[in-house]
A protein has these predicted regions:
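A compositional/biophysical signature of low hydrophobicity enriched in polar/charged and small residues
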Residues: 1-172
């Protein structure tokens, strides 16, 4: 299998720049509560508001902070059916894999896509309202891609942990 960044620039590997203790406090605080005002954040990390704001902007520009969003409860918005899908593709030349990656990135039902080692080439996380919608996604979208050779679906019975903050202890 050819290993390279995903088809979208969004996922390109960024060079690692040094984070100091204050930067680590800022990203930990924002990860815990992305709605903090700059004044609240500055107070939490021990800075005045102006330097705090500059640091946040730098962390955003350097790619440490990708964005801010509300985390929705899937079941409350009618997306209570989650499937983890292992996909094998035909051939592993860059152009074949890129076609698959570009197609999957455009599918709104796919909330995560990973290039993996092991039995599958890719592992997708798919969310839909119910089983019939997954069947429609599978037959009407995923299996219509000529590069897809095999699909193995694993239906989530219960979610014990999802959307957890990233562990940042190694940065300190």
């Amino acid at each position: 299998m050819v290993i390279r960044p995903l088809a979208t620039e969004k996922y390109a590997v960024m060079p690692k720049t040094a984070l100091d203790v204050i930067d680590c406090r800022i990203i930990a605080a924002l990860q815990a509560n992305g709605r903090l005002s700059n004044i609240e954040l500055a107070e939490l990390v021990g800075l005045s508001p102006s330097p705090c704001s500059r640091r946040v902007k730098r962390l955003e520009q350097d790619g440490y902070i990708e964005g801010y969003r509300a985390v929705l409860r899937r079941d409350r918005v009618g997306l209570g059916f989650s499937v983890f899908v292992g996909v094998k593709i035909n051939g592993h030349a860059n152009e074949h894999a890129l076609l698959f990656e570009r197609a999957v990135v455009e599918m709104p039902e796919v909330v995560a896509c990973h290039l993996v080692s092991g039995e599958a080439d890719y592992f997708l996380e798919v969310v839909v309202p119910e089983l019939a919608d997954y069947q429609q996604f599978l037959v009407g979208k995923l299996l219509t891609l000529p590069i897809v050779r095999e699909v193995r679906s694993n239906i989530a019975i219960q979610t014990l942990k999802a959307g957890a903050p990233l562990p940042l202890d190694h940065l300190q």
